[in-house]
């Protein structure tokens, strides 16, 4: 089944990209989008922001008021500040709990759409061969391993093919990442050498 073969390969590529590069970006983007919607969480976030501004403003007024010369005013500001700070901390804990719940839900949905889909495909197509090997091409023991757990002998199962795809994609991803890091490091080194050479040249001209 070429379509299943290609689907599993591209699904593993997508999983690697999402989990290695874009997971935090996707989570942050979904959170920003959710905060734009008229939900209870967005209301809590706005209230939290307003409370934070109020606490900061009262703190500034307290610092600008002398506790000795204007004790009555300072004490009143202190009480307002302490009350506002307490309310802000309660609201902040409420917001943090909701954010934690949102993060767990997003991670669960991401897993269901990537790794969970792989698990489903492996279960649903466990008896379906990805491709067939040439007859007597390899020992029967190896054929049994390649067809594990339920594919016909002489074929490659979706479990084995998926595992091979995951390993190869990870190796290629690591190689690309190492190459990119090396190129950036070389570029920074060349720029540092140019800057150093320019400084030496200017020093020679001054002399």
Curated annotation (Swiss-Prot):
Amino-acid biosynthesis as UniProt keyword: no
Residue intervals annotated with topology Lumenal: 1-4, 132-155
Keywords for the protein's UniProt record, in alphabetical order: Coiled coil, Endoplasmic reticulum, Membrane, Transmembrane, Transmembrane helix, Transport
Coiled coil: 44-97
Main location: endoplasmic reticulum
Compartments in which it is found: Endoplasmic reticulum membrane
Topology of this chain in the membrane: Multi-pass membrane protein
GO CC annotations on file: endoplasmic reticulum membrane; GET complex
GO molecular function: protein-membrane adaptor activity
Cytoplasmic domain ranges by topology: 25-110, 173-207
Stretches that traverse the bilayer: 5-24, 111-131, 156-172
Disulphide bridges, residue numbers: none
InterPro entries tied to this protein: Get1 (IPR028945), Get1_fungi (IPR027538), Helix_hairpin_bin_sf (IPR029012)
A Gene Ontology BP annotation from the UniProt entry: tail-anchored membrane protein insertion into ER membrane
Recorded superkingdom: Eukaryota
PANTHER family: GUIDED ENTRY OF TAIL-ANCHORED PROTEINS FACTOR 1, TAIL-ANCHORED PROTEIN INSERTION RECEPTOR WRB
Subunit relationships: Interacts with GET3.
Function recorded in the entry: Required for the post-translational delivery of tail-anchored (TA) proteins to the endoplasmic reticulum. Acts as a membrane receptor for soluble GET3, which recognizes and selectively binds the transmembrane domain of TA proteins in the cytosol.
Family per similarity comment: Belongs to the WRB/GET1 family.
Name by which UniProt lists this protein: Protein GET1
Gene expressing this chain: GET1
